Every structure is written in structure tokens, then in C-alpha cells.
Swiss-Prot record:
GO terms under biological process: photosynthesis, light reaction
InterPro entries membership: NADH_Q_OxRdtase_suD, NADH_UbQ_OxRdtase_49kDa_CS, NDH1_su_D/H, NiFe-Hase_large
Domain of life: Eukaryota
Catalytic activity: a plastoquinone + NADH + (n+1) H(+)(in) = a plastoquinol + NAD(+) + n H(+)(out); a plastoquinone + NADPH + (n+1) H(+)(in) = a plastoquinol + NADP(+) + n H(+)(out)
NCBIfam families xref list: PRK06075.1, PRK07415.1
EC number(s) per entry: 7.1.1.-
Protein name (record): NAD(P)H-quinone oxidoreductase subunit H, chloroplastic
Assembly behavior: NDH is composed of at least 16 different subunits, 5 of which are encoded in the nucleus.
Protein localization: Plastid, Chloroplast thylakoid membrane
Pfam families: Complex1_49kDa (PF00346)
Taxonomic lineage of the native organism: Eukaryota, Viridiplantae, Streptophyta, Embryophyta, Tracheophyta
């Protein structure tokens, strides 16, 4: 009697592209042997809009509304890097009050981004309840944004030399109330998620990245800090006024999906600490540098004329970008967000290269999922935290 031989053909499965509200329009071509992942090939570019080329045909002020469409869940950071680069090129000083307002907005945006990472991440691994709790907290942050900027998501709030408007009356008290409330929410998450045995079973020891490996791949943000590298641009580059606050860089040694979760949860607590200190110590003074108007190329300027305030369509000042090159970067929720800017004595940048953290961090995905189970792909992909708007640009 002959025993029938079992076929051992590999199976090729397409995962995605998903809806942008989940993991974005990312397609993974996965080769499987049963449930074991043999190979994984990410296919990018479904959300490519030519953001760098658009930047080279716009002035910096005209380009500001576009940048909120890179990482549309942490728009304050894309605005910050867009104004920081020309500020450094033109040596423009930002008033102390404006710098404090920027830090408050950046840290609120960091919390909102981490919350919107945590909800779908938990849903991916089978926990539906935290998803609704997280949206409850996120709505409160968006209410604060709406009161200060007029918009819930695409804020267009940062300006070269400051911010668009001062904080409205009563906003600081509302924000302090939110900080007190949110600390209890973090404790709730710790109780609900961190010590949950089913959650730990799904994430502990899954997708391990060593410290040296993380550096070699160019990882940044929580991906790097979860691998034992204590690197945070807020401490390294001393931008804005982060040096004036008492806070610690959050990091873990294990390098797995659980470590990346713990880093982000701890970062939210540190962000609240920074916001509370900034709100209590915010100085008076102007919220924008009025001197930047001297950069206006129009010689016969009308900024100071009496009837100017009655003109419905006001011309924006334009800035000559000096003939030099510059790399500016900020610590975004997902990692190092940078811009390589080359000026050419014109109002348009000669080159505008975006360094998105999600694109760099996503490179390690095929290596992480090999020899893992099919169900672990969503755990690992979720722990990387990508937004395809900034990956594809």
C-alpha cells in the first residue's frame, strides 16, 4: 500500500490595501507555508501625491496647508517642521510665548496620535473595548484644538515666527482640567491592557529588534527607544523650549511589540507632565514675531496703512530663501520627521526633501515577520505605527 504524498505548495496571499482609517493603503504580498510566513513584500505608493514636487512650486506660506496631509493624525508636527526650516535659514527668532504655545500643541498632538495608534492596535489583536475608551479621550483633545485653532484635524496653526493666534480666554484652565482627567485615563488603560494575560500572550516576544539592528536600519522614535537606545530629539537638538521643563525620555530594553507599547503609554504621561509645566509657566508677550514682515519682497508694503485692515483679500508676505542648504528635524510621535531644504535666493525652495519616520520604520517589516505566524503580522505592523500619507507622500 502506497501512502499518498502531501502537497507542500506555498500559498501567496494579498493583505490590503486597507481603508486609510485602518493601516492605510498598504498592500502586503505574503508567502505562506501553512500558517508560517516565508516572505513578505510591501507594495507602496497608493497614496502618493507628489508632495515634494508641490513644495518646489509653492512659497513656504502657500505650502503650509498641504503639509497637514502627510501625517494627518499628528498635523502639528508637520506644521512645526515646515516653519522651523525657514526660521533657521532666515535666523528668525520666535517669541517665548509662541514657543510655549507650540510645545503645548505639539504634546497634545503627540497624545492624540498615540491614542489613535493604541485603539486600532488593540482592535487588531482582538480587544474591542479599549477602542471606544480611546476615542472618548481623543475627542477631548480635538475639542481643545478646535477652540484654539478653529479646526479639529488640519489645523494650519503654525506660522513662520510664531503661531496664527493667541490662546483664547479660558483655554488654559480647560487644558489643565483635561490633563488631570487624562492621568486617570492612563491608569485605566494600564489596568485594562498592560496586565491583561491575553494581550501579553499576543505581544510579548513578538517582533524583537535589537539595539544595534535598530540603529543600522535607521529606526527612530518609539521603535528605537523600545530597543534600548535612549534617543529623543527633544533632548538632543534642544529645539523650542523643551529644556525648560522637567521630563524623562521613556525607553525599554526588550525591543518587542510589548516594549513599543510601553514606550508609547509612558510617553503620554510625560507629555501631560510637559503640558502642565508649560501651561503654568507660560509667559506674556506677543504670539508672533512681527519683525518677519521685513522679509517681505514687496517694496511698497501696505502692512501698516490704515485702510489695509478693511481689505478682504490680504496678500501674504513672501520670503526669500537664502542660497544655502539645511536639514531640520523634530521628534514626531512616530519618529524623526525631517526636511532637507535647499534655498536658491528665490521664494520657492530649490529642493524640498521630506524624511518621514513611517517610511524608514516600515523597511524592517519584511525581516520582522519572516518565520512568524500569519496572525503576528497585524501585531507587528500595528506596533510599528505607520500612516500611509507620510510613507507615500
Amino acid at each position: 500500500m502506497t501512502v499518498p504524498s502531501t502537497r507542500k505548495d506555498l500559498m501567496i496571499v494579498n493583505m490590503g490595501p486597507h481603508h486609510p482609517s485602518m493601516h492605510g493603503v498598504l498592500r502586503l504580498i505574503v508567502t505562506l507555508d501553512g500558517e508560517d510566513v516565508i516572505d513578505c513584500e510591501p507594495i507602496l505608493g497608493y497614496l502618493h501625491r507628489g508632495m515634494e514636487k508641490i513644495a518646489e512650486n509653492r512659497t513656504i506660506i502657500q505650502y503650509l496647508p498641504y503639509v497637514t496631509r502627510w501625517d494627518y493624525l499628528a498635523t502639528m508636527f508637520t506644521e512645526a517642521i515646515t516653519v522651523n526650516a525657514p526660521e533657521q535659514l532666515g535666523n528668525i527668532q520666535v517669541p517665548k510665548r509662541a514657543s510655549y504655545i507650540r510645545v503645548i500643541m505639539l504634546e497634545l498632538s503627540r497624545i492624540a496620535s498615540h491614542l489613535l495608534w493604541l485603539g486600532p492596535f488593540m482592535a487588531d489583536i482582538g480587544a474591542q473595548t479599549p477602542f471606544f475608551y480611546i476615542f472618548r479621550e481623543r475627542e477631548l483633545i480635538y475639542d481643545l484644538f478646535e477652540a484654539a485653532t478653529g479646526m479639529r484635524m488640519m489645523h494650519n496653526f503654525f506660522r513662520i515666527g510664531g503661531v496664527a493666534a493667541d490662546l483664547p480666554h479660558g483655554w488654559i484652565d480647560k487644558c489643565l482640567d483635561f490633563c488631570d482627567y487624562f492621568l486617570t485615563g492612563i491608569a485605566e488603560y494600564q489596568k485594562l491592557i498592560t496586565r491583561n494575560p491575553i494581550f501579553l500572550e499576543r505581544v510579548e516576544g513578538v517582533g524583537i529588534i535589537g539595539g544595534e539592528e535598530a540603529i543600522n536600519w535607521g529606526l527612530s522614535g518609539p521603535m528605537l527607544r523600545a530597543s534600548g537606545i535612549e534617543w529623543d530629539l527633544r533632548k538632543v537638538d534642544h529645539y523650542e523650549c523643551y529644556d525648560e521643563f522637567d521630563w524623562e525620555v521613556q525607553w525599554q530594553k526588550e525591543g518587542d511589540s510589548l516594549a513599543r507599547y510601553l514606550v508609547r503609554i509612558s510617553e503620554m504621561t510625560e507629555s501631560i507632565k510637559i503640558i502642565q509645566q508649560a501651561l503654568e509657566g507660560i509667559p506674556g508677550g506677543p504670539y508672533e514675531n512681527l519683525e518677519i514682515r521685513r522679509f517681505d519682497r514687496v517694496k511698497d508694503t501696505v502692512w501698516n496703512e490704515f485702510d489695509y485692515r478693511f481689505i478682504s483679500k490680504k496678500p501674504s508676505p513672501t520670503f526669500e530663501l537664502s542660497k544655502q542648504e539645511l536639514y531640520a528635524r523634530v521628534e514626531a510621535p512616530k519618529g524623526e520627521l525631517g526636511i532637507f531644504l535647499i534655498g536658491d535666493k528665490g521664494v520657492f525652495p530649490w529642493r524640498y526633501k521630506i524624511r518621514p519616520p513611517g517610511f524608514i520604520n516600515l523597511q524592517i517589516l519584511p525581516q520582522l515577520v519572516k518565520r512568524m505566524k500569519l496572525a503576528d503580522i497585524m501585531t507587528i505592523l500595528g506596533s510599528i505605527d505607520i500612516i500611509m500619507g507620510e510613507v507615500d507622500r
